[in-house]
């Protein structure tokens, strides 16, 4: 059996009881470590806490391992119980859907244990979940690569009065361009996690490029950091205001606010930007 288990967003205690039972009876436990992170990141202490709480050694699975060697994990699940741990909910990334398809194609039983994810946890700010349009991803810009396909999606959402959840880039164990060119042993860039501030800077750059007045410095947004953890940060304000806020450690995400209901506005007041945020 292959168990794909959502861990939630905070720490090791956010796993569901059903998920914990599945982990404890698994012979091997992998943890996906590139589409999201728990509040402690990838620190050795954090991983040790997970292993103590779950009572199992945990193998960190980076992007290369999951996308290139998933077959080995699936083979192990033919005759054994194998757990694959995912921060948030298992289907927050297409990679995990692919894993299910491959396992079922080979006749391996799959059981999914759901949990909270950023997709529903953003509801804490008071913006109603059914009032969101398509979610977009904001990638890190480079000197030669500045993709902006998210702009048209935000434009469509705003034309319909809908809120837009922006998921911000995470770059963990990414090979350096130089090592890819050389071939042989790969060298990796240090981890990078996009901040709300960087996301807004890039969004405004794209707006300036297109000039369709989809959003601007005065557009209302909500910035989030470390959703689901005890020290989560939530601030509502204009893009210009949020660009100067210190949201602290990752992970961050951003919501561009659409048309609001009075109840939504009342909730947002609790998180309103104050000078000194």
From Swiss-Prot:
What are the UniProt keywords, alphabetically? Methyltransferase, S-adenosyl-L-methionine, Transferase
Alphabetized CDD domains for the sequence: DHP5_DphB (cd11647)
Listed under catalytic activity are: 2-[(3S)-amino-3-carboxypropyl]-L-histidyl-[translation elongation factor 2] + 4 S-adenosyl-L-methionine = diphthine methyl ester-[translation elongation factor 2] + 4 S-adenosyl-L-homocysteine + 3 H(+)
EC number from the UniProt entry: 2.1.1.314
Which residues does S-adenosyl-L-methionine bind? 9, 89, 92, 117-118, 168, 227, 252
Entry annotated with the keyword Methyltransferase: yes
Q: Which domain of life is it from?
A: Eukaryota
- Family to which the UniProt record says this protein belongs: Belongs to the diphthine synthase family.
Please identify the protein, giving its name as recorded: Probable diphthine methyl ester synthase
Lineage runs: Eukaryota, Viridiplantae, Streptophyta, Embryophyta, Tracheophyta
């Amino acid at each position: 059996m292959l168990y794909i288990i959502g861990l939630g967003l905070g720490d090791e205690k956010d796993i569901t009881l059903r998920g914990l039972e599945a982990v404890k009876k698994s012979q091997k436990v992998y943890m996906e470590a590139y589409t999201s992170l728990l509040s402690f990141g990838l620190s050795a202490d954090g991983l040790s806490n997970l292993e103590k709480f779950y009572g199992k050694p945990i193998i960190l699975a980076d992007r290369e391992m999951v996308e290139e060697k998933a077959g080995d994990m699936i083979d192990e699940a033919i005759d054994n119980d194998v757990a694959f741990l995912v921060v948030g909910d298992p289907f927050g990334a297409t990679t995990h859907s692919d894993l299910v398809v491959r396992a079922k194609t080979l006749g391996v039983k799959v059981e999914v244990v759901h949990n909270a994810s950023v997709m529903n946890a953003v509801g804490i700010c008071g913006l109603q979940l059914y009032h969101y349009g398509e979610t977009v991803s904001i990638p890190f810009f480079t000197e030669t690569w500045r993709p902006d396909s998210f702009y048209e999606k935000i434009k469509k959402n705003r034309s319909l009065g809908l809120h837009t959840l922006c998921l911000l880039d995470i770059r963990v164990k990414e090979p350096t361009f130089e090592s890819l060119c050389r071939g042989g042993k790969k060298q990796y860039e240090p981890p990078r996690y996009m901040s709300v501030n960087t996301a807004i800077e890039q969004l405004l750059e794209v707006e300036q490029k297109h000039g369709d007045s989809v959003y601007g410095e005065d557009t209302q947004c909500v910035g989030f950091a470390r959703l689901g953890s005890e020290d989560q940060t939530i601030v509502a304000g204009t893009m210009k205001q949020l660009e100067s806020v210190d949201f602290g450690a990752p992970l961050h995400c951003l919501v561009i606010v659409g048309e609001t209901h009075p109840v939504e506005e009342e909730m947002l007041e609790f998180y309103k930007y104050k000078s000194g945020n």
